[in-house]
Amino acid sequence: ALLKMIHLINRKSISICDYFNSLCFIPIAVSYEFDPNDIFKANELYALDMHQEYQKTDKEDLNSITNGISGQKGMVNLSIGSPIKFTKESYEDSAKLITRSILQLYKLQPSNFAACDIENTAYKPDHNFSEQQIKSARVYLEKRTQGLEPGIKALLLKQYSNPVIEKSKL
Protein backbone atom coordinates (compact mmCIF):
# COMPACT_ATOMS: atom_id res chain seq x y z
CA ALA A 1 0.00 0.00 0.00
CA LEU A 2 2.86 2.37 0.80
CA LEU A 3 4.48 1.77 -2.59
CA LYS A 4 1.17 2.47 -4.28
CA MET A 5 0.90 5.76 -2.39
CA ILE A 6 4.46 6.72 -3.37
CA HIS A 7 3.64 6.07 -7.04
CA LEU A 8 0.16 7.65 -6.87
CA ILE A 9 0.99 11.09 -8.22
CA ASN A 10 2.84 9.68 -11.25
CA ARG A 11 0.79 6.54 -11.85
CA LYS A 12 -0.63 7.69 -15.20
CA SER A 13 2.60 9.06 -16.63
CA ILE A 14 5.33 6.59 -15.63
CA SER A 15 5.47 2.84 -15.04
CA ILE A 16 6.09 1.31 -11.62
CA CYS A 17 9.58 0.10 -12.61
CA ASP A 18 10.64 3.34 -14.22
CA TYR A 19 9.37 5.42 -11.31
CA PHE A 20 10.89 3.29 -8.55
CA ASN A 21 14.17 3.00 -10.45
CA SER A 22 14.25 6.81 -10.77
CA LEU A 23 13.92 7.10 -6.97
CA CYS A 24 17.05 4.99 -6.50
CA PHE A 25 15.90 2.84 -3.56
CA ILE A 26 18.94 1.81 -1.52
CA PRO A 27 18.30 -0.99 0.98
CA ILE A 28 19.65 -0.57 4.50
CA ALA A 29 19.61 -3.19 7.23
CA VAL A 30 20.39 -2.51 10.87
CA SER A 31 20.75 -5.49 13.16
CA TYR A 32 21.65 -5.58 16.79
CA GLU A 33 22.13 -8.43 19.18
CA PHE A 34 19.58 -7.27 21.74
CA ASP A 35 16.50 -5.10 21.37
CA PRO A 36 15.98 -2.84 24.39
CA ASN A 37 12.28 -2.65 23.49
CA ASP A 38 11.70 -6.38 22.98
CA ILE A 39 9.46 -6.81 26.05
CA PHE A 40 7.39 -3.73 25.18
CA LYS A 41 6.88 -5.00 21.61
CA ALA A 42 5.97 -8.50 22.83
CA ASN A 43 3.42 -7.09 25.29
CA GLU A 44 1.79 -4.98 22.58
CA LEU A 45 1.69 -7.88 20.11
CA TYR A 46 0.27 -10.19 22.76
CA ALA A 47 -2.53 -7.76 23.61
CA LEU A 48 -3.40 -7.47 19.91
CA ASP A 49 -3.23 -11.26 19.44
CA MET A 50 -5.65 -11.65 22.35
CA HIS A 51 -7.96 -9.14 20.64
CA GLN A 52 -7.49 -6.74 23.51
CA GLU A 53 -7.32 -3.05 22.93
CA TYR A 54 -3.79 -1.80 23.36
CA GLN A 55 -3.76 1.73 24.68
CA LYS A 56 -0.41 3.48 24.46
CA THR A 57 0.51 5.87 27.22
CA ASP A 58 1.08 9.54 26.39
CA LYS A 59 4.85 9.27 26.12
CA GLU A 60 5.19 5.60 25.17
CA ASP A 61 6.54 6.24 21.67
CA LEU A 62 9.01 8.82 22.96
CA ASN A 63 10.12 6.44 25.72
CA SER A 64 10.57 3.65 23.15
CA ILE A 65 12.76 5.88 20.98
CA THR A 66 14.83 6.96 23.99
CA ASN A 67 15.15 3.38 25.22
CA GLY A 68 16.04 2.20 21.72
CA ILE A 69 18.83 4.76 21.44
CA SER A 70 20.29 4.44 24.92
CA GLY A 71 19.45 0.83 25.82
CA GLN A 72 21.78 -2.19 25.71
CA LYS A 73 22.02 -3.53 22.14
CA GLY A 74 25.15 -5.67 22.20
CA MET A 75 26.74 -6.05 18.77
CA VAL A 76 25.35 -3.69 16.13
CA ASN A 77 25.69 -3.97 12.36
CA LEU A 78 24.70 -1.46 9.67
CA SER A 79 24.69 -2.73 6.08
CA ILE A 80 24.03 -0.48 3.09
CA GLY A 81 23.29 -2.12 -0.24
CA SER A 82 23.36 -1.10 -3.86
CA PRO A 83 20.41 0.58 -5.59
CA ILE A 84 17.57 -1.85 -6.23
CA LYS A 85 16.79 -2.55 -9.89
CA PHE A 86 13.03 -2.97 -10.28
CA THR A 87 11.98 -5.18 -13.20
CA LYS A 88 8.34 -6.12 -12.53
CA GLU A 89 5.28 -3.92 -12.93
CA SER A 90 3.65 -4.96 -9.67
CA TYR A 91 3.56 -3.33 -6.25
CA GLU A 92 3.55 -6.75 -4.60
CA ASP A 93 6.62 -7.89 -6.55
CA SER A 94 8.34 -4.59 -5.79
CA ALA A 95 7.63 -5.00 -2.06
CA LYS A 96 9.01 -8.55 -2.15
CA LEU A 97 12.15 -7.33 -3.91
CA ILE A 98 12.70 -4.63 -1.27
CA THR A 99 12.16 -7.12 1.55
CA ARG A 100 14.51 -9.66 -0.03
CA SER A 101 17.17 -6.97 -0.58
CA ILE A 102 17.03 -5.93 3.07
CA LEU A 103 17.05 -9.54 4.32
CA GLN A 104 20.13 -10.31 2.25
CA LEU A 105 21.95 -7.46 3.99
CA TYR A 106 20.69 -8.30 7.49
CA LYS A 107 23.49 -9.68 9.67
CA LEU A 108 22.30 -12.34 12.06
CA GLN A 109 23.46 -12.12 15.67
CA PRO A 110 24.11 -14.78 18.34
CA SER A 111 20.77 -13.89 19.95
CA ASN A 112 18.94 -14.92 16.77
CA PHE A 113 20.39 -18.43 16.94
CA ALA A 114 19.99 -18.61 20.73
CA ALA A 115 16.26 -17.86 20.36
CA CYS A 116 15.98 -20.66 17.79
CA ASP A 117 17.66 -23.00 20.27
CA ILE A 118 15.29 -22.01 23.08
CA GLU A 119 12.27 -22.48 20.79
CA ASN A 120 13.68 -25.73 19.36
CA THR A 121 13.45 -24.17 15.90
CA ALA A 122 15.61 -26.01 13.39
CA TYR A 123 18.08 -23.90 11.43
CA LYS A 124 21.19 -24.35 9.37
CA PRO A 125 24.14 -23.52 11.60
CA ASP A 126 25.39 -21.12 8.95
CA HIS A 127 27.25 -18.68 11.19
CA ASN A 128 30.70 -17.97 12.54
CA PHE A 129 29.71 -17.46 16.16
CA SER A 130 31.33 -19.53 18.87
CA GLU A 131 29.38 -21.89 21.05
CA GLN A 132 30.14 -19.53 23.94
CA GLN A 133 28.63 -16.53 22.10
CA ILE A 134 25.42 -18.47 21.45
CA LYS A 135 25.36 -19.72 25.04
CA SER A 136 25.83 -16.19 26.43
CA ALA A 137 22.99 -14.90 24.25
CA ARG A 138 20.82 -17.80 25.39
CA VAL A 139 21.49 -16.99 29.06
CA TYR A 140 20.62 -13.34 28.38
CA LEU A 141 17.34 -14.27 26.65
CA GLU A 142 16.40 -16.78 29.35
CA LYS A 143 16.93 -14.13 32.04
CA ARG A 144 15.09 -11.55 29.93
CA THR A 145 12.05 -13.79 29.52
CA GLN A 146 12.02 -15.14 33.08
CA GLY A 147 8.65 -14.51 34.67
CA LEU A 148 6.95 -13.45 31.45
CA GLU A 149 3.60 -14.95 30.59
CA PRO A 150 4.18 -17.86 28.14
CA GLY A 151 2.45 -16.09 25.25
CA ILE A 152 4.52 -12.94 25.73
CA LYS A 153 7.71 -14.99 26.08
CA ALA A 154 6.95 -16.81 22.80
CA LEU A 155 6.41 -13.51 20.97
CA LEU A 156 9.61 -12.05 22.36
CA LEU A 157 11.64 -15.09 21.27
CA LYS A 158 10.00 -14.98 17.85
CA GLN A 159 11.33 -11.43 17.38
CA TYR A 160 14.82 -12.88 17.66
CA SER A 161 14.32 -16.18 15.78
CA ASN A 162 12.29 -14.82 12.87
CA PRO A 163 15.29 -13.31 11.00
CA VAL A 164 16.96 -16.76 10.94
CA ILE A 165 13.78 -18.34 9.59
CA GLU A 166 13.25 -15.64 6.96
CA LYS A 167 16.88 -15.64 5.80
CA SER A 168 16.74 -19.42 5.39
CA LYS A 169 13.98 -18.90 2.80
CA LEU A 170 16.24 -16.81 0.55
Report the location of each language-model feature.
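Membrane-interfacial terminal anchoring regions of lipid-handling membrane enzymes
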Residues: 1-170
